[in-house]
C-alpha cells in the first residue's frame, strides 16, 4: 500500500488533496469593451454606411504562451509511475505527461482516451482494447499495443515489486493481438479495473525511454501527454514545456491540440503556512487551502474560492486488532460512542468538514446516508461508559478507567506528522477518552516511518485519512488481513469479495451498502469526518478544470491579464 495508497485508493493523506469537482471552475467572464463597427443608418431619407464606436459585451478569446506556476507539496522521489504511490508524484504524472487508455467523465463513467473502444467478454474476464493510431510519445516513438503490454507487465512482474500491483486485481496477462489491439485477461471479473486504469496505474509511458534510462527513468519520464519534462531542480522546482505535437482525445477538454500554456512550473512549497503568502504575492496561481486560512480568501475579489463538499475522503480511527482489548467488538463500539465528531469538525477543521459514520466516503458510489444514520454511533459518553462496563471496564472513585484486571487504562494513538488538522483531531480523540478516565498518549511521525510502524505492535489505535473515488477502497483497508496485516476474518470478507467481482453498477452499489453495514456492525473502525476540499484561484486564471479523479486538465488553462 502507500504513502497515498494509490490512485484508486488513490490519493491519500496529504495537504494538497485535489478537489473532485468535474466542471470548469474559472471560465472567462464577459466584459464590456468599445469597438468600431460598420453600421447602416438612415440620414435624411437616405441610407448610408458609416463607422461609429459602440459598446458591446464580449468574452475574451483564450490566448496561449503563458507560464503556469503551481505548488508542489513535496519534491517527488521519482516520476516513474510503476514505482511510486506518492500523492504528489501521482498528480504530476497524471496531469502533465502520462495518459491512460480511459478516463472518467463528470458522471463517473469510463470514456475512451488512448483507447478508441473496448469489448468485454460474456464472462467478463477478458477486456479487449482497440487503440488509437498515429499517437506518439513526446520522444517521437510510437504508442501501440506493445507499449501498453510493456507498462502493465512491469507492474505485474514480482521482481519489480510495484506498489500498483494490487490495483490490477486478478489480472493474469496482457496480450498483443495486433499493433493496435491489446487484450487483458483476468482470473475472475474485477469491477474496479476501469477506474484503476484511469488513474496512474494505467499510465502508458515510452518503453524506449524506460529502457534507455533504466533506474534513472524516474528523473527522465516520457509520455504521450500535453507536456514534457524540461528541468528538475531537486527541492526547488520542476519545469515542463509544451508538447507541440500533442493531440487531445478527451471530450471534456475544449482544446484538441497542444495546450495553450507554453510552460508549467511546479514550485516545491512544503510548508502549509507559506501557501497564503505565495497566493497573495502571485507567486502561485492556485493554492489548496487549509481550514485555518479559507476565511482570508473568501470574498477577496482577487481570488475565486472553490469549496467541494462532495468529497471522497474519510478521517477515521483504526484499531490494532492483534492487541486486547481491541479484539473485542464491545470495546470498539464503546470507543465509537465516546468520540465527539462535531467537536472534531469544529475545533480541528474550523467547521469545513462533515461528520462521518460510514467507513465509505460520502462522495463514493454506493454511499447511502440512510445506512450511515441507521448504523452510526452518535456521541454518547454515557452509553460508552455502559458498553465499557459490559466489557469489564469500570471507573473508580477518582474517575480513572480500570481494565478487567483492575489496572488503569492507558493507550497509544498514533498518526502522521505535518498535517495540522489531523493533529488537532488527535487531540479531540485524546480529550474525549480522557473524559472517560482513559489516559491517551499521542505519537506522530513522518509518513513513511508512521506507516511502516503499523506493521508492528507498538500502537493501540491510529488516526488515518484515505481518499478514493471507488468503493474498492473498503477492500484495500478492511478485507482481511487488511492493509497493515492486522484485520481478522469476518462476515465482511465475503461481501467485499462479491463487490469486487460485481460488474453491474446498480448491483455493485447494493453490495457496497451491505459491506458498509457489516463493517459498521462489527465496529471495524471509527469514522469521524470527511473534510471538504478547498482551493483559491487567482481571478485572472481561466478554464481551470478538475476532473472526476481530482486531476487538473491543463490543456485549456490560460491567463486573462
Pin down the residues of each PLM region.
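Surface-exposed binding/hinge segments that line
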Residues: 130, 165-209, 226-233
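Structural transition elements
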Residues: 227, 320, 355-397, 417-424
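Ligand-site clamp/hinge motif
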Residues: 218, 248-297, 427-431, 437-441, ...
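Extracellular/periplasmic solute-recognition and catalytic clefts
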Residues: 155, 159, 173-175, 230-241, ...
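Detector for C-terminal structural segments
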Residues: 92-95, 233-238, 338-371, 421-431, ...
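Gly/Pro-rich hinge or "lid" segments in bacterial periplasmic/extracellular proteins
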Residues: 105-109, 198-265, 271-273, 380-386, ...
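N-terminal lobe/hinge region of extracytoplasmic solute-binding protein
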Residues: 71-122, 153, 222
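Aromatic- and charge-enriched surface segment that lines or borders ligand/interaction sites
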Residues: 116-161, 177, 183, 325-327
Amino acid at each position: 500500500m502507500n504513502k497515498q495508497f494509490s490512485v484508486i485508493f488513490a490519493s491519500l493523506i496529504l495537504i494538497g488533496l485535489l478537489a473532485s469537482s468535474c466542471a470548469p471552475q474559472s471560465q472567462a467572464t464577459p466584459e464590456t469593451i468599445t469597438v468600431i463597427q460598420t453600421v447602416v443608418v438612415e440620414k435624411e431619407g437616405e441610407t448610408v454606411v458609416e463607422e461609429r464606436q459602440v459598446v458591446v459585451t464580449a468574452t475574451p478569446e483564450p490566448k496561449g504562451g503563458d507560464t503556469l506556476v503551481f505548488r508542489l507539496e513535496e519534491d517527488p522521489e521519482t516520476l516513474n509511475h510503476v514505482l511510486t504511490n506518492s500523492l504528489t508524484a501521482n498528480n504530476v504524472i497524471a496531469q502533465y505527461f502520462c495518459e491512460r487508455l480511459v478516463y472518467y467523465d463528470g458522471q463517473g463513467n469510463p470514456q475512451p482516451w488512448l483507447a478508441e473502444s473496448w469489448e468485454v467478454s460474456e464472462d467478463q474476464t477478458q477486456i479487449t482494447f482497440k487503440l488509437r493510431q498515429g499517437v506518439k510519445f513526446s520522444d517521437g516513438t510510437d504508442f501501440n499495443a506493445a507499449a501498453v503490454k510493456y507498462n502493465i507487465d512491469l507492474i505485474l512482474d514480482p521482481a519489480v515489486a510495484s506498489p500498483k500491483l494490487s490495483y490490477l486485481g486478478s489480472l493474469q496477462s496482457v496480450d498483443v493481438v495486433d499493433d493496435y489491439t491489446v487484450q487483458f485477461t483476468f482470473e475472475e471479473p474485477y469491477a474496479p479495473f476501469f477506474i484503476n486504469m484511469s488513474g496512474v496505474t494505467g499510465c502508458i509511458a515510452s518503453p524506449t525511454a524506460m529502457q534507455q534510462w533504466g533506474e534513472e527513468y524516474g528523473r527522465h519520464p516520457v509520455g504521450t501527454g500535453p507536456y514534457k519534462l524540461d528541468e528538475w531542480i531537486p527541492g526547488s522546482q520542476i519545469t515542463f514545456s509544451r508538447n507541440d505535437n500533442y493531440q487531445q482525445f478527451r471530450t471534456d477538454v475544449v482544446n484538441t491540440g497542444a495546450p495553450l500554456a507554453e510552460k508549467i512550473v511546479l514550485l516545491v512549497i512544503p510548508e502549509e503556512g507559506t501557501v497564503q503568502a505565495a497566493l497573495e504575492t502571485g507567486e502561485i496561481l492556485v493554492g489548496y487551502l487549509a481550514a485555518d486560512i479559507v476565511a482570508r480568501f473568501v470574498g477577496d475579489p482577487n481570488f475565486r474560492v472553490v469549496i467541494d463538499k462532495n468529497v471522497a475522503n474519510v478521517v477515521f480511527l483504526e484499531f490494532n486488532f492483534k492487541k486486547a482489548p481491541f479484539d473485542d467488538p464491545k470495546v470498539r463500539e464503546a470507543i465509537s460512542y465516546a468520540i465527539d465528531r462535531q467537536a472534531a469538525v469544529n475545533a480541528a477543521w474550523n467547521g469545513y468538514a462533515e461528520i462521518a459514520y460510514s467507513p465509505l466516503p460520502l462522495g463514493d458510489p454506493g454511499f447511502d446516508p440512510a445506512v450511515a444514520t441507521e448504523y452510526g454511533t452518535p456521541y454518547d459518553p454515557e452509553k460508552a461508559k455502559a458498553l465499557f462496563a459490559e466489557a469489564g471496564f469500570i471507573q473508580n472513585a477518582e474517575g480513572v478507567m480500570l481494565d478487567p484486571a483492575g489496572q488503569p487504562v492507558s493507550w497509544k494513538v498514533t498518526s502522521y506528522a505535518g498535517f495540522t488538522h489531523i493533529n488537532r483531531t488527535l487531540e479531540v480523540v485524546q480529550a474525549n477518552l480522557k473524559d472517560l478516565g482513559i489516559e491517551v498518549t499521542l505519537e506522530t511521525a513522518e509518513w513513511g516511518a508512521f506507516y511502516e510502524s503499523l506493521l508492528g505492535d507498538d500502537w493501540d489505535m491510529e488516526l488515518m485519512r484515505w481518499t478514493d473515488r471507488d468503493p474498492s477502497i473498503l477492500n484495500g483497508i478492511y478485507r482481511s488481513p487488511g492493509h497493515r496485516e492486522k484485520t481478522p476474518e469476518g462476515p465482511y470478507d465475503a461481501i467485499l469479495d462479491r463487490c469486487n467481482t460485481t460488474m453491474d453498477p446498480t448491483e455493485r452499489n447494493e453490495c457496497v451498502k451491505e459491506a458498509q453495514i457489516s463493517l459498521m456492525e462489527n465496529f471495524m473502525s471509527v469514522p469521524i469526518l470527511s473534510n471538504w476540499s478547498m482551493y483559491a484561484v487567482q481571478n485572472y486564471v481561466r478554464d481551470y478544470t478538475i476532473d472526476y479523479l481530482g486531476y487538473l486538465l491543463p490543456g485549456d488553462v490560460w491567463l486573462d491579464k
